[in-house]
């Protein structure tokens, strides 16, 4: 059973309520979701609004720290109580939202919700935990140096989105992490934990009256306040091909993203371009995989993806060949991208992919938790809430002319960003000789310069 509404007696506590009932198992889940994530880092009241590095990572820092001391409990006491209840508590910060979630057996659920209520409303922000968290965040940045795929996406986003919010990493930088403090965390909490900025969601063996009771009983201290999600500006579209080589020593394999800016999720072109992108590189039998892996064995995987969110995201292809085959792989993907943009889908691709997307959609909404996550994201992004139900029919209605128009409008094969994590000395000379990169702008940056 599925319901979505804001009841009149809880509307002063939250901006929206989403419920996905499933009584097959005696498990319950309650979520509170902030309408903002790390894109808000440089706009929170009470903190420096200059756009400087000190603000990056604040949302992640402040929200994670809520988990480490709240109400009358220390971090250890929170963990001990959760263990005794067999409950799970998580806080996750993304660019577009922060998710607070508690899960437990139905018989222990209200006691578990009490802990979530303390975490959301009454964090103590202990100083010792603040310093421990700072050390952990810095250690995570050290670990990132060993994660070629993580480095690839970080540098690609920084280059593509520039100074706009999606160009800033969720967890910040070493410099910004060192500058984070408890005053900033308290200010972030005061500004963002307000009624109009929160969406409630529940899933599992729980009814709407029960959810409303929990909200009234345990979350009445959330102060009144408006939505805090400000529009996310789009970066300017740069002309010409750019090659960013993230220079890392002794790489035997290259990680490569080739992409561009894409339409907003709300744009009418988004769905036709999504259908076309999945046909191009979204399945194991797609053109990109077939040409790169099956026919030539250049990369174990080859995929293309169209992003979505509150702001304008990206379209990119991802491959990871050996170092000596980097130039050959880049040349091939560029040629395939050009062919895709100029000639569109091949015969049979559209019919196959429409059928594939309609059938596979069932797996994305298979469980109550899946549906809750999707519908929460839709509400955060101000998308139509019937999106999940109408998706198969809308995919079926995408025509060849819709796809042709979307591709003509959005695909920019001459203005692609090519980001490569590799050893520069081993790949740069061969890349510079490629005809498709003859006029490209090349830049080499150290892999640890993030």
Each language-model region and where it sits:
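Short, conserved secondary-structure transition motifs
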Residues: 104, 137-144, 234-246, 355-364
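A short, acidic, amphipathic alpha-helical segment used as a generic capping/interface helix at domain edges
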Residues: 396-407
């Amino acid at each position: 059973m599925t319901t979505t509404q804001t009841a009149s007696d809880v509307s002063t506590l939250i901006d929206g309520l989403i419920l996905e009932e499933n009584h097959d198992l005696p498990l319950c889940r309650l979520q509170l979701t902030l309408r903002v994530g790390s894109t808000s880092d440089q706009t929170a009241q009470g903190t420096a609004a200059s756009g400087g590095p000190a603000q990056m990572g604040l949302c992640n820092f402040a929200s994670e720290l809520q988990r480490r001391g709240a109400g009358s409990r220390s971090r250890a006491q929170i963990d001990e109580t959760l263990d005794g209840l067999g409950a799970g508590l998580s806080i996750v910060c993304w660019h577009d939202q922060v998710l607070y979630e508690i899960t437990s057996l139905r018989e222990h659920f209200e006691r578990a919700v009490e802990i979530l209520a303390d975490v959301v409303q009454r964090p103590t922000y202990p100083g010792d935990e603040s310093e421990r968290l700072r050390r952990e965040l810095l250690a995570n940045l050290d670990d990132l140096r060993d994660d070629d795929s993580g480095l690839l996406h970080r540098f690609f986003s920084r280059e593509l989105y520039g100074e706009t919010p999606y160009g800033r990493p969720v967890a910040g930088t070493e410099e910004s992490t060192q500058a984070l403090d408890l005053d900033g965390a308290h200010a972030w909490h005061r500004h963002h934990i307000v009624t109009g900025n929160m969406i409630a969601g529940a899933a599992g063996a729980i009814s709407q009256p029960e959810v409303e009771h929990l909200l009234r009983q345990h979350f009445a201290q959330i102060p009144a306040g408006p939505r805090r999600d400000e529009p996310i500006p789009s970066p300017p579209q740069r002309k010409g091909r750019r090659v960013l080589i993230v220079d890392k020593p002794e790489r035997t394999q290259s990680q490569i993203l080739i992409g561009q800016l894409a339409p907003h999720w709300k744009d009418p072109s988004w769905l036709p371009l999504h259908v076309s992108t999945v046909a191009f590189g979204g399945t194991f039998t797609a053109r990109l995989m077939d040409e790169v892996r099956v026919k030539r064995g250049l990369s174990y995987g080859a995929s293309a993806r169209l992003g979505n969110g509150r702001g304008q995201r990206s379209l990119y292809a991802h491959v990871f060949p050996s170092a000596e085959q980097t130039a050959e792989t880049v040349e091939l993907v560029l040629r395939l991208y050009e062919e895709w943009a100029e000639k569109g889908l091949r015969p049979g691709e559209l019919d196959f992919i429409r059928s594939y997307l309609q059938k596979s959609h069932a797996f994305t909404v298979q469980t109550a938790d899946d549906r809750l996550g999707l519908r929460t994201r839709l509400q955060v992004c101000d998308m139509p809430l019937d999106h999940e139900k109408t998706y198969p029919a809308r995919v079926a209605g995408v025509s060849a002319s819709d796809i042709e128009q979307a591709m003509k409008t959005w695909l920019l094969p001459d203005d692609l960003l090519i980001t490569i994590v590799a050893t520069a000395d081993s790949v740069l000379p061969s890349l510079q000789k490629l005809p498709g990169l003859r006029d490209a702008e090349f830049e080499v940056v150290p892999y640890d310069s993030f």
